[in-house]
From Swiss-Prot:
It holds the Pfam family RNA_pol_Rpb1_2. It comes from Panax ginseng. The gene is rpoC1. Belongs to the RNA polymerase beta' chain family. RpoC1 subfamily. This is DNA-directed RNA polymerase subunit beta'. SUPFAM superfamilies: beta and beta-prime subunits of DNA dependent RNA-polymerase. The keyword Protein biosynthesis does not apply. Its EC number is 2.7.7.6. It catalyses: RNA(n) + a ribonucleoside 5'-triphosphate = RNA(n+1) + diphosphate.
């Protein structure tokens, strides 16, 4: 449907019988109204043409071939001069055959039938509104018992029954005998209500606002009593309060959506368009039919039988009528949801019939597979792998995927730069993978974001925008910090990539959907781009060092390990080692590591800036080394101070490792980049 803002939307809910009739009925040019399916037949076994008023009737659902009626006559579609617009012999309109994808029909039920979703699904909406046990309502729906209508003011049979003792044997046996008499239909229609009709009458008598007020009053009364000390009673009260809350919310929803409660009981059963439940001819002349067709046939057979019992056979026993109503109810239940809270119906090969619920629900259902998960142009799919060298807002796109997604843009670039005379020549260059193709592809990708999506998309961070870069291989590279937003793991998960085409979509991707703009959880506001798993392990290894400290003693087990340029004797715990190297800056330290002169966790002394003090006023030096020129070294736990003869601080060295230096430089560059970006701001 399309709302007033011209937004296409799909809304699921209950509708009135009048609305179903409006959807299905259509008036032919001769004034005849068609739409009701009355016969359980599909195709004639000799002519292979749809049966009239059957499940594939061309009068109801439209012609199988565009502009050709059931008689074989042909008319040009849309030609205003050709009259009439339908065949006078078979009554089929000369319209496009695509009408069979959306034209509905309906079955007029001989008795009301409850919708199984509202009755047997938990929580049961019908049971909540009527405030009655589900088991009692099921017994009423399936004609296991009845209730009396309080409509007659004069003494009636049921009113007189209260003046007798039901325990008397003669009275107990007289009631069943009366139910089998010929006058039972009149008595039943006047005073007894059973089946789904009884549910419909009770739902029609409900006042939703009174339900809300009474439930609220009862909820407040239960809350005023407080705990009784009896655990069983307190649980019972708690369950009752929860039920009242659900009942009020349900009533408010019915009021807000303008849905009447009695619409949960069906009088007209919609029939799906035939193209959504096709019959296909396979090899050998055999026909393959959708299971829904067989379930519809079952409903029509039983409904027609009930209609005959109510109209033609006046002497039909009441018990037989009630039994047939139960069969109609069960047939509709099987059509809507086969096997809900019971044994499913099976065919001759012991295969469970696929009902309407099975068609639309689940991963392979109509919504998730066809509507939500349908394949679209300018999209691809591949496995994701970690790309630690990528920026947070970038993703690595394989060349094979990128050239397919941006092929039209590359073709336009080749033609504009006069590198190809037409589309065919441009495609030929792309197939041959000429170097100029990759240059143009990179130019195109620089100004065009892509969208990455991981199913299931449970919140808005399931789709984020990235700036693509070309990578080798066939996997999509992703920054590890965005993993949590997608709820993805790098263990074989797949993600889909989409190219936004319109300017509005590209602007939305850049302003709202880029990954570096979605650092907080939209639900609770906590940071969502945080290091996890292997990133934490990597940071630990990077900054762990050898953890020996400057004070080497024989009780530290780390001192027993062998290091380069170091020997430890276990006999007398004496050790000799080369002096730890001194570096003037971090570049020299990292250069020494790359030349394999030191290890990642080897301790070293790094000159520190004097303006960044690391001195603790209360800390005393562990050792003091004096030199011949008067300068001396004060050695502390994790730093070293070089002082002049006048006790002025000349240099400060900190004891660190290459791993610490690398992490510090990354953090420093990130902070400087952030400050630089902020300086250009308003």
């Amino acid at each position: 449907m399309i709302d007033r803002y011209k937004h296409q939307q799909l809304r699921i809910g209950s509708v009135s019988p009048q609305q179903i009739s409006t959807w299905a009925n259509k008036i032919l040019p001769n004034g005849e109204i068609v739409g009701e399916v009355t016969k359980p037949y599909t195709f004639h076994y000799k002519t292979n043409k749809p049966e009239k008023d059957g499940l594939f009737c061309e009068r109801i659902f439209g012609p199988i071939k565009s502009g050709i009626c059931a008689c074989g006559n042909y008319r040009v579609i849309g030609n205003e001069k050709e009259d009439p617009k339908f065949c006078e012999q078979c009554g089929v309109e000369f319209v496009d055959s695509r009408i069979r994808r959306y034209q509905m029909g309906y079955i007029k039920l001989a008795c009301p039938v409850t919708h199984v979703w509202y009755l047997k699904r938990l929580p049961s909406y019908i049971a909540n509104l009527l405030d009655k046990p589900l088991k009692e309502l099921e017994g009423l729906v399936y004609c296991d018992f009845s209730f009396a209508r309080p409509i007659a003011k004069k003494p009636t049979f049921l009113r007189l029954r209260g003046s007798f003792e039901y325990e008397i044997q003669s009275w107990k046996y007289s009631i069943p005998l009366f139910f089998t008499t010929q006058g039972f239909d009149t008595f039943r229609n006047r005073e007894i209500s059973t089946g789904a009709g009884a549910i419909r009458e009770q739902l029609a008598d409900l006042d939703l606002r009174i339900i809300i007020d009474s439930s609220l009053v009862e909820w407040k009364e239960l809350g005023e009593d407080g705990p009784t000390g009896n655990e069983w009673e307190d649980r019972k009260v708690g369950r009752r309060k929860d039920f009242l809350v659900r009942r009020m919310e349900l009533a408010k929803h019915f009021i807000r959506t303008n849905i009447e409660p009695e619409w949960m009981v069906l009088c007209l059963l919609p029939v799906l368009p035939p193209e959504l439940r096709p019959i296909i001819q396979i090899d050998g002349g055999k026909l393959m039919s959708s299971d829904i067709n067989e379930l519809y046939r079952r409903v029509i057979y039983r409904n027609n039988t009930l209609t005959d019992l109510l109209t033609t056979s006046r002497s039909t026993p009441g018990e037989l009528v009630m039994c047939q109503e139960k069969l109609v109810q069960e047939a509709v239940d099987t059509l809507l949801d086969n096997g809900i809270r019971g044994q499913p119906m099976r065919d001759g090969h012991n295969k469970v019939y696929k009902s309407f619920s099975d068609v639309i629900e689940g991963k392979e259902g109509r919504f998730r597979e066809t509507l939500l998960g349908k394949r679209v142009d300018y999209s691809g799919r591949s496995v994701i792998v970690v790309g630690p060298s990528l920026s947070l807002h970038r993703c690595g796109l394989p060349r094979e995927i990128a050239i397919e997604l941006f092929q039209t843009f590359v073709i336009r670039g080749l033609i504009r730069q006069h590198l190809a005379s037409n589309i065919g020549v441009a495609k030929s260059k792309i197939r041959e993978k000429e170097p100029i193709v990759w240059e143009i592809l990179q130019e195109v990708m620089q100004g065009h974001p892509v969208l990455l999506n991981r199913a299931p998309t449970l919140h808005r961070l399931g789709i984020q925008a990235f700036q693509p870069v070309l990578v080798e291989g066939r996997a999509i590279c992703l920054h590890p910090l965005v993993r949590k937003g997608f709820n993805a793991d790098f263990d074989g998960d797949q993600m889909a990539v989409h190219v936004p085409l319109s300017l509005e979509a590209q602007a939305e991707a850049r302003l709202l959907m880029f990954s570096h703009m979605n650092l907080l959880s939209p639900a609770i506001g906590d940071p969502i781009s945080v290091p996890t798993q292997d990133m934490l392990i990597g940071l630990y290894v990077l900054t762990s060092g050898n953890r020996r400290g400057i004070c080497v003693n024989r009780y530290n087990p780390c001192n027993r390990r062998n290091y380069q340029n170091e020997r430890i004797y276990d006999n007398n715990y004496k050790y000799t080692k080369k002096k730890e190297p001194f570096f003037c800056n971090s570049y020299d330290a990292i250069g020494a590591y790359r030349q394999k002169r030191i290890n990642l966790d080897s301790p070293l002394w790094l000159r520190w800036r004097l303006d960044q003090r690391v001195i603790s006023a209360k800390e005393a030096p562990l050792e003091v080394h004096y030199e011949s020129l008067g300068t001396y070294y004060e050695i502390y736990g994790q730093y070293l101070i070089v002082r002049s003869i006048k006790k002025e601080i000349l240099y400060i060295y900190i004891r660190t490792t290459v791993g610490h230096i690398s992490l510090y430089r990354e953090i420093e560059e990130a902070i400087q980049g952030f400050c630089q970006a902020c300086s250009y701001g308003p």
